[in-house]
Amino acid sequence: VELIGLLALSILLGLRHGIDLDHVAALADITGGSSGSKKERMKLSLWYAGGHEAVVFVLGCSILVFAWSVPIWADQWMGKAVGITLIFMAILILIGRRNGNGAYWSRGIAIFQKLRRRNGEPFTFTRRNVFTVGVIHGIGAETPTQLLLFTTVAGVAATNHGMLAVAAFSIGLLLSHAIIAIVSIWFHDLAKKVRPLLPVTMYAACLFSFVLGVSYLLE
């Protein structure tokens, strides 16, 4: 009974952690790309989620097995790095970058296009780079729900039960990310149908990312 309660709590914490603002901003960016089908954008979102969830699982297990977690100073710097990234991507969309078809690039596509080019072609999202972004977000900016999970598993006597709790948290997190991705894809596509050359959701996401990035820097 205690194990079932622990797993249920972990899943709920994972669902709650999945709707943290930095996750929403990242998934809105990935799903807001002007190219790619719904299926392709959903796959990329799941790769981002996979990177994030993998880090959470490793960190949780490291607490159980080695009694080790990310140092406070490292977590603070990673949080600020996330903030800088969000601000930089928001500024890029504001300068009105366009692709060859006249549609606006998403913030993430714009930043990757500016930082790197492959074979002369604009650099866009791939499984590898969205997975990497997920890993970075998993390390930085630990939230109360994530810290509560780590505190809970640290107090579990049986290591295998603690690992099950971390796995349950990751499952809840994955479900939350999947739902956000589906909703985000739907909103972006709806906005493109209404105003193809000026999708409102892109600019709303841009403002959201900028404000969120500033808040991370001020923490």
What is each of the regions a protein language model found here?
Residues 95-138, 193-196:
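Alpha-helical multi-pass membrane helix bundles of inner-membrane/thylakoid proteins
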Residues 2-71, 147-163, 187-188:
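Juxtamembrane transmembrane-helix termini in multi-pass membrane transport proteins
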Residues 14-22, 137-143, 177-179:
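Short helix-coil transition sites and intra-membrane helix breaks within transmembrane domains
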Residues 5, 39-116:
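Membrane helix-loop-helix hairpins that form the core translocation module of multi-pass transporters
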Residues 56, 131-133, 137-148, 205-209:
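Core segments of transmembrane alpha-helices
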Residues 20-23, 52, 87, 142, ...:
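Divalent metal-coordination and catalytic microenvironments
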Residues 13, 44-48, 52, 133, ...:
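Alpha-helical transmembrane segments of multi-pass membrane proteins, especially transporters
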Residues 32, 60-85, 95-100, 152-163, ...:
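Transmembrane-helix boundary and interhelical-loop signature of multi-pass inner-membrane proteins
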